[in-house]
Amino acid sequence: MGWLTKILKGSSHKFSDGQCNGRYREDRNLEGPRYSAEGSDFDKEEIECAIALSLSEQEHVIPQDDKGKKIIEYKSETEEDDDDDEDEDEEYMRAQLEAAEEEERRVAQAQIEEEEKRRAEAQLEETEKLLAKARLEEEEMRRSKAQLEEDELLAKALQESMNVGSPPRYDPGNILQPYPFLIPSSHRICVGCQAEIGHGRFLSCMGGVWHPECFCCNACDKPIIDYEFSMSGNRPYHKLCYKEQHHPKCDVCHNFIPTNPAGLIEYRAHPFWMQKYCPSHERDGTPRCCSCERMEPKDTKYLILDDGRKLCLECLDSAIMDTHECQPLYLEIREFYEGLHMKVEQQIPMLLVERSALNEAMEGEKHGHHHLPETRGLCLSEEQTVTTVLRRPRIGAGYKLIDMITEPCRLIRRCEVTAILILYGLPRLLTGSILAHEMMHAWLRLNGYPNLRPEVEEGICQVLAHMWLESETYAGSTLVDIASSSSSAVVSASSKKGERSDFEKKLGEFFKHQIESDSSSAYGDGFRQGNQAVLKHGLRRTLDHIRLTGTFP
């Protein structure tokens, strides 16, 4: 009893005062409600201790004088009633405790539901923003294509520029000459200012007559005094002004694109970037970026890699240059496969190598399908020694990479797959898609798939590369998994990297476009067949069908 008294001295004092002259029952009933009202300030343990203390004091009060005897006698006479009251008090206190607990649970549940509702609304709002942005980008691409078509039409129209002359003249060098006879002024209203044209010089063209100062170029707003002028949408232009506004310019040399021997304006345009350039740049050695394929403009310098490739500065911004730097991305690709329930159990070495080392390794490989203009990744099955890029090079004079450290690496075969080799110096998204492609080769070999035709093996590998790019494009938003029946929605761990630049997002769309528009039989046709199969049947059923038949379903 000592430790209870120490904790609840106030409560002990109040209950002991209520035990004299037979008024214990009445005082306890008065004290009970007040105590329950204050009980919200105590936790359950304090209330239970108070009840135990009260009961203990009632049972152990044994006075020694005559008055004490009276009290004891009174208690024994009313002992049964007191027990009932005590039971009622305990029941009341327990009811209060249960009510308080229920209220706490209800409030907590309401708070949880409110928080979940708020998060769901925030997620929905974010998804709507991303979808709106995607629609905006699609609209911009559509407008770019429309603008390109309009440029082509304008280029043709330029060849048929309108030659407008005045009525028969005495001086052929003067476009502004009077009529050989007088016309009443009421019959001559200037199309430009709607005022009458009096006696004097005037210009007759475009189905009307003009004051010389009213017939102006729509671009520079200066009078057109030349014998010839150009038209666009019923608006007149100086020939030079029209050319400046509507004649296509080369995005590489920044000059007007010249006409061909037939007198027509002919130029090339990249199907994705819409970069316009003179046909001559395809023959004069103008370099292209090895990643995005854009030509190098004359006022911009591309970075020169050790193996001769050139890299634009935008692609350089996210380029992966050595094996160590690529390891986090390699782990992300493995996590991507785990999310598809296609975990690669074997720890396969992954190395970044130069182009020469990749070509040598490809020659030593006994089997494989490599029909691309340039091999950028390889899944090895044979023991070889390859040279890997050990340390990231730095940029030296003339935008050349220098001080790159390499070392030979002996690859020992411990399973069906020896290593995965990736070409160094490519942007993160391109490196990741190549890794996802080669990882699928490894998965097929480690899981006992038979020797497949190139269209089937390369096609399904391209499907996985495309799926990874899709997950990167929509990272952080709601994904509709294209392999819906085979796995849950896959969100790449790269979504933790934060917001990517607009160019990197555009670059991801370009790499998807490359896969989708590939014209080769193994990679292009194979991807389109495999992608249709996955969309229709799901990834898991497609893989099961390939295992059984060696073909797409």
Swiss-Prot record:
GO terms for biological process: regulation of DNA endoreduplication. The gene is DAR1. The modification Phosphoserine is found at residue 166. Residues 10-41, 62-91 are annotated as: Disordered. This is Protein DA1-related 1. It holds the Pfam family DA1-like. Residues 42-61, 87-106, 122-141, 149-168 form the UIM domain. Interacts with ubiquitin, TCP14 and TCP15. It comes from the Eukaryota. Residues 188-248 form the LIM zinc-binding domain. CDD domains: LIM_DA1. Acts redundantly with DA1 and DAR2 to regulate endoreduplication during leaf development. Together with DA1 and DAR2, modulates the protein stability of the transcription factors TCP14 and TCP15, which repress endoreduplication by directly regulating the expression of cell-cycle genes. One of its GO terms (molecular function) is peptidase activity. The UIM domains bind molecules modified by monoubiquitin or ubiquitin chains and promote coupled monoubiquitination. Residues 78-91 have a biased composition (Acidic residues). Residues 62-77 have a biased composition (Basic and acidic residues). Polyubiquitinated by DA2.
